[in-house]
Amino acid sequence: MTGWSGLFIEVPLYRLASKVCCHLRGPQGFLQRACQGVCCLPRDSRAAGIMEEKRKSFISQILILGEVLCMVDVSMSIKCGILFLLFGGAISNLGSPEHVTKWFWPLKEQKYTGMFAMTERGHGSNVRGIQTEATFDLDNQEFVIDMPCENAHKMYIGNAMHGNYAAVFAQLIIEGKSQGPHCFIVPIRDENGNLYPGVTAIDMMHKEGMNGVDNGILIFDKVRIPRENLLDKFGSVTPDGQYHSPIQSKNARFNAILATLTPSRLAVTFQALGAMKLGLMIAIRYSHSRRQFGPKDKEEVKIIEHQMQALRLMSHLATALAVTFTSRHADDILDEDIFQGRALTNSRSLQALMAGLKAYSTWETVSCLQDCRECTGGMGYMMETRISDLKCDTDVFVTFEGDNVVMLQVVARELLAQYSKQHKKNLLLGVIQNWTATAGDKLRTSFLAFNTDTVGCLAFLLKAVNFRERVLQRSLVSRIYYKVVTKKGDFFSAWNSCMHHVTSLSLAHIHRVALEQFTTAVRQCPNREDQALLMKFCLLYGTKLVFQERGWYLEHKYLTPKASMLIRAQLLNLCESVKDDALKVISAFNIPHITIRAPKTGIPNPGAAEAAYPAPMQPLVRDAARAQLAKL
């Protein structure tokens, strides 16, 4: 399809990605080849003529390449992310220029590999509470990395069994006082792969999926590192043992440290998208080739003709498009901020968007792949189809890089902060605006309301998702205010008692942003034929959002029972109308055929020997018995 530039993997980048993927199919050096592809991307990109400003678009290229690599092998994509986005990102975002020269450039040249050690046995999402300690030894000008208890053991650490260095988060302690979590570069293995004294690495062995990543446990027993190994962008220790930071508040400093690491959440969104698109391509291709049932005395019909098959797959395809457009939007903002040298700590709305997208996209990926598996029947259960493999590999996406419920709390806190800031500028004006907005929403749902928008049109759907977000935001503000200010309760208990409301508001916000970005993509599409098809999927996505929350809309009288039935009918009709054009859409994903390895989709791949059923070396016992029965 034409006119989809910037929304999917563009053709020049597809060629580069396909070249990298073909390169990766070699029998040896799988991860090494992948790392080469990531490291040499700026040079290859220039040769391919992709971008004029390679530096400005470098983050975009890395994220999209991560999406493509996830289609090849999820484990490989994740391990590349560990090396360059997590470990490398910690050095470049938390370290000084000297740290970048000393650690990052050798990493890029593949002189060593690293790992990212933040999660502990006792603390995962609550990074502030980690128990690993880095105590400054003034006499020796060293930090002593130690773990006072078993709960401080670093767990689920990717590349733990092979990495040479680790970016270790620990409480920085000077003269018995903690300055909060900081990041340190700790040597793990020498050039021969031998662990340094005081370091223990334990293989966590088999997991549900992603077994190509060597997750392990790291234990430090009084490991000494030079003072210079502290990544000191937000906090440094002088030779005389004095702590200095450009940010005086410990809480603000901690938030700044974490903010610089949030781009990895957007990377997870891109990786989830890669798995989602591949699963949909396989399931949709299969549904257009497989036939089951049909009218009496007539040919069986393709299973995509069955209503539930189309409903399940087309709804997910619309969601994949919406997440694609929204993630590209977030990527553009991130790329521009980094290119202009803006601090991510000041981009709270972007942090919230990346956190919300990570939660929404990974939950949708898990749901999508489950439906893809069911829609492909027994073949979906076979490893050769790759869907079951993708399911197992991506299940962890909902908890790593931040548990999804925690991610949604990041979104809600930012929305509350925006609400508070808006009303603090001018208290009287804020009260008036709040009153008029509330009155307007009540009028909109009263018997006096006169709705000029046809139920189900794009304008109606956009207003519906905006209405839901506004109402949930005001409702959460009033609940928190009542519990904390009126009832004098503590904030933690008040927040916890509103958690269902918090997650509902955050998802409503992401739904609204996604539908608006989808609408923008439709309007910017230069090709009329493509624009018409995109509009159908945009309507389908918006209709799906309203339909899945129809109970809430009925409760708030935004929908009447009749309107709810119209929404359901529109959802079914749209799925029916786009099911044949879905082949064009998945073709526009530009997924390299070398990555698909699913013969039942009708895509030949002679390089995928593992997807074939080999002939037995000798006749099976049951075959001999069957031959005897044939003679009787």
Curated annotation (Swiss-Prot):
* Enzyme Commission no: 1.3.3.-
* Keyword Oxidoreductase included in the entry's annotation: yes
Source domain of life: Eukaryota
The enzyme's first-digit EC class, named in words, is: oxidoreductase
Show the InterPro entries listed in the entry: ACOX_C_alpha1, Acyl-CoA_Oxase/DH_mid-dom, Acyl-CoA_Oxase/DH_mid-dom_sf, Acyl-CoA_oxidase, Acyl-CoA_oxidase_C, AcylCo_DH-like_C, AcylCoA_DH/oxidase_NM_dom_sf
GO MF entry, a single one: FAD binding
Cofactor(s) needed: FAD
Listed under GO biological process in this entry are:
fatty acid beta-oxidation
Which sites bind FAD? 376-381
- Cross-referenced Pfam families: ACOX (PF01756), ACOX_C_alpha1 (PF22924), Acyl-CoA_dh_M (PF02770)
Q: Tell me the protein's name.
A: Acyl-coenzyme A oxidase-like protein
Source organism of this protein record:
Mus musculus
Classification from the root reads: Eukaryota, Metazoa, Chordata, Craniata, Vertebrata
